[in-house]
Structures are given as structure tokens and as C-alpha cells.
UniProtKB/Swiss-Prot annotation:
Pfam families: SDH_C, Shikimate_DH, Shikimate_dh_N. Pathway: Metabolic intermediate biosynthesis; chorismate biosynthesis; chorismate from D-erythrose 4-phosphate and phosphoenolpyruvate: step 4/7. It comes from Brevibacillus brevis (strain 47 / JCM 6285 / NBRC 100599). GO terms for molecular function: NADP binding; shikimate 3-dehydrogenase (NADP+) activity. It catalyses: shikimate + NADP(+) = 3-dehydroshikimate + NADPH + H(+). Involved in the biosynthesis of the chorismate, which leads to the biosynthesis of aromatic amino acids. Catalyzes the reversible NADPH linked reduction of 3-dehydroshikimate (DHSA) to yield shikimate (SA). This is Shikimate dehydrogenase (NADP(+)).
């Protein structure tokens, strides 16, 4: 029950009606008995500055930030965590001692779920990544900081891939996969990651990589979690590759935000279960 002592957190985005975050976080708050409540706020871009002022005025403990505000919100905050600065986007804001601090939990949420669910040793990985957008930046920078051997980027826009390769290349060897070189790049990779929306509902017959490029020595990871098993993952499983779906990243990025706001460990099992139940209802 919400009382006068309830600590409020929430989500700023546009639109937000599809979000699983309120259900996931409120279930976690109930499970832990913490006096927090989570709401989704549909904030149009022209109202973002007022909404950020509202965090201060209303005493919110923090917020999640989603599309289209992850970059636009950065100059409105008092401090940006170094990893979020490198990624160039914020997905979590914490209000601490009157200051608003921006973090990005997407990359660490991804890495935490990948390691927990597959047992993968990151230091041994040669990574091929499909995509060079915001999700790709978060994942690439975090994997680089965790010490993977090499990152290869496949992307429709070479220009965007070049920018990401240049920045990540300051930490770990990174190269662009040129047109026609995708199959060869994946052939001697150990981890393949789809960071694009190719294969997401309703376009479930699409896949970012032809099945014949996959091999059993791969761990194939897809950031999409709706559907829970994309065509890419089905085809990878069929040839004996290890597969990893996007639900773990979604749950763990939320769990890390929960921990930043509350200082308590998040009940990730409960959070995962409620999201799974919700997805099964809607698919």
C-alpha cells in the first residue's frame, strides 16, 4: 500500500504503455518489503526538462530512462557515472543528497545475465556483434571493460559502426566487418550477439544472421526478449550452439537500478518470473 512514507521511483519515456518495468519493480518491492512504489510517466521530449525538475521538487528517489530520453537527459543531471559517459547514454538516475546522478545499467545487466546463464569466461571471447546503436554501445563498452579478446561489428551503416569501433577500440581490439565478410568473421568467433530489433515481434520470421553462418562452438545471444526465443536462437539451438535470450539483460538492468535506489539486493528470481508470466500472456 502507498502511504505518506512511500519512496517513489519511476520510468521516463515516450511511449511507456508497453513497459514491463512497473510490474517487475513493484513485485520486487513487495517481495522485499521495502516502502517503494514504481510508476511509468509518459514524458514527451519537450517536457523532459520539467520532468527532471519534478524529480527534485517531488523528492523521487530516482528514475529509469528509456527511449527517446537516454541521451537528451544527460546535460540535465548533476553528475554522470564514468561508464554511462563512455556509453553516451543514461538509463537510470539516482537522487542522492540533492544531486541527480546518471548511470547506465544496460551493459552490466547484460554481462551479469550472460555469465550467470551460460557460465561463459569473458576473457576468452572473440565477439561478433550485429548492430551499432544504443544497446550495442552499452554492451560493447561493458564487454571491453570486462576484458574480452576482440570485438567485431556488423552493421548496415558503416559510418555508425566506425564511430563505435573507434571508441571501443581504445579499450580492446575492435574492427568493422565489411560487407561480404560476415560469415568469415562469425566462423572463428566464440560469442555472437544480436543487438538489433531484427526478429522482434511481430517480425518473428526475420533473423540478423543466416543459419548457415552459425556453428556449434558459438554462444549465440539475442537482446530481444519478445519472443522469448527468436528465430536466431532457435536456429542456433538446432545446430548445438549455446543460446542466451534477452530476458536476463532486461531483468538484470532493472535489478541493478533497484540496487542503486535502495542499497538492497534485488530479488532477481521473482523479477524474472513476473516478466515471464506477463510475456506469456501477451504472446
Amino acid at each position: 500500500m502507498i502511504t505518506s512514507k512511500t519512496q517513489l521511483v519511476g520510468l521516463f519515456g515516450h511511449p511507456v504503455s508497453h513497459s514491463q518495468s512497473p510490474m517487475m519493480h513493484n513485485t520486487a518491492f513487495l517481495e522485499t518489503g521495502l516502502g517503494f512504489a514504481y510508476a511509468a510517466f509518459d514524458v514527451e521530449p519537450e517536457n523532459l526538462e520539467d520532468a527532471v525538475a519534478g524529480i527534485r521538487a517531488l523528492g523521487l528517489k530516482g528514475i529509469n530512462v528509456t527511449i527517446p530520453h537516454k541521451v537528451a537527459i544527460m546535460p540535465m543531471l548533476d553528475e554522470i557515472d564514468p561508464l554511462a559517459k563512455r556509453i553516451g547514454a543514461v538509463n537510470t538516475v539516482v537522487s542522492r543528497d540533492g544531486r541527480l546522478i546518471g548511470y547506465n545499467t544496460d551493459g552490466m545487466g547484460y554481462v551479469r545475465s550472460l555469465v550467470e546463464e551460460t557460465g561463459i569466461v569473458l576473457e576468452k571471447q572473440v565477439v561478433t556483434m550485429v548492430g551499432a546503436g544504443g544497446a550495442a554501445r552499452a554492451v560493447a563498452f561493458t564487454l571491453a571493460e570486462q576484458g574480452v579478446k576482440e570485438i567485431r561489428i556488423i552493421n548496415r551503416s558503416r559510418e555508425r559502426a566506425a564511430v563505435l569501433a573507434e571508441h571501443v577500440g581504445m579499450i580492446v581490439p575492435t574492427k568493422i566487418v565489411e560487407q561480404g565478410e560476415g560469415e568469415a568473421a562469425i566462423a572463428d568467433s566464440s560469442l555472437l550477439i544480436n543487438t538489433t530489433s531484427i526478429g522482434m515481434l511481430p517480425n518473428v520470421q526475420e533473423t540478423p544472421v543466416p543459419a548457415e553462418w552459425l556453428h556449434s562452438g558459438l554462444t549465440v545471444s539475442d537482446l530481444i526478449y519478445n519472443p522469448l526465443e527468436t528465430r536466431l536462437l532457435k536456429e542456433a539451438r538446432a545446430i548445438g550452439a549455446t543460446v542466451h535470450s534477452g530476458i536476463g539483460m532486461f531483468v538484470n538492468q532493472g535489478a541493478l537500478a533497484f540496487e542503486l535506489w535502495t542499497g538492497e539486493q534485488a530479488p532477481t528470481g521473482v523479477m524474472r518470473e513476473v516478466v515471464l508470466q506477463q510475456l506469456k500472456k501477451t504472446t
